[in-house]
Amino acid sequence: MRTPETHAREVAAALPARQVTTVALHRAQDMVLSADIHAGFPSPRFDNSQMDGYALPQCAAGTYLVGPTIAAGDDPIRVLNGPLGAACPIMTGAKVPEGTAAIVPIEHCEPQEFLSPGARITVPETSPGQFIRRTGSDLEEGALLAARDDKLTPVRLAALASQGIDEVEVSRPARILICTGGAEIGHGNAAIPDANAPLLTAMAHRAGIEVAGYIATNDDPQALTHAFAEAIALNHPDAVVTSGGISAGKFEVVRQVLDGWFGHVDQQPGGPQGIATFHDTPVICLPGNPISTLVSFRLFVAPALGWAPEPFRVPLAAGIEGLPHKKQFRRGRVDSHAHILGGASSHLLAQAADATHLIRIPAGQRLEAGEEVEVYPL
């Protein structure tokens, strides 16, 4: 029986190498970088004012002669024709003149207004460097700005833009087909509505994976073979992700159609797993119970084909008994502690609706409140 870690490696090894493409920065949100990016210059690029106020040549309280105004974007050397020698009005973000001891905010001045050159302004005592943003205080030149495999979040995109970067090399989003169904799927009295297709679609989008199309099964191996061939020829996916049809039942149609590895991973839920190919296209086979599908996609598909946040450790809010021989992935939410939500069974979809994380419970252990566990953001 495989461990979850071993199976994750096997899934990744079965997939083609991620292709690299160059995209405009404004189109790169949630994509994954393919190479490190370093800062080409420090940020801020120069000492600048944190406030609208006056640039002072010294920190002493007193009344100062007012000099020319320095606006954001002005070169102080051209405005002043030399170092600072008076109290000069300065705007937020403006480059600080040579010789500036501190910035005093306009609201601390008397009068509280920007005066014309030649007038006099009274200011309180200030501390050296007050309200001056120093060169490189956010990022030094050459520092790592974004690393390979980082997800391009809005803030990371803004940091790249602040360096004058307008395009990036990213891993091309993987394209998948989603295969769900079975003869039981439908809306009759004994039928089951398909929850797995929308679940997998939403999880794929969150992981930065494109859904190219869908395949529905009806427990007929010949029909599924035809559906696979037609959908793959039409959509040219990087992989197919199936849900259900791989366990030990009489109608395990996915397992009947595909050649590959089918076995068990020592985890609950999501024990049955499979890795196969169809006409040279990788097929990742997940179990069909909704929570098993959820857990399996998060652990094995999202990291291999897209992006998933790294797990981290937090203390448990309440004690729990682990299963004797299997690692367990319970659903829960995390604040300062990990809180388990709902029961352990793999059909309890509604009870998992508020979950934000998977909580990993080691096999054969009793964990008490306050002991740390590994959690996986969903």
Model-inferred region functions:
Residues 54, 63-65, 86-89, 101, ...:
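Structural motif
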Residues 2, 21-25, 30, 34-35, ...:
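Flexible glycine/proline-rich
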Residues 182-183, 191, 204, 208-314:
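Short glycine/threonine-rich loop/turn motifs
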Residues 1-166:
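Phosphate-interaction motifs
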Residues 131-243, 247:
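Phosphate-binding glycine-rich loops and their immediate beta-loop-alpha structural context
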Residues 47-49, 58, 77-83, 96-98, ...:
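Solvent-exposed alpha-helices and their adjacent loops that cap or buttress functional pockets
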Residues 89-91, 124, 147, 177-181, ...:
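Short beta-strand segments
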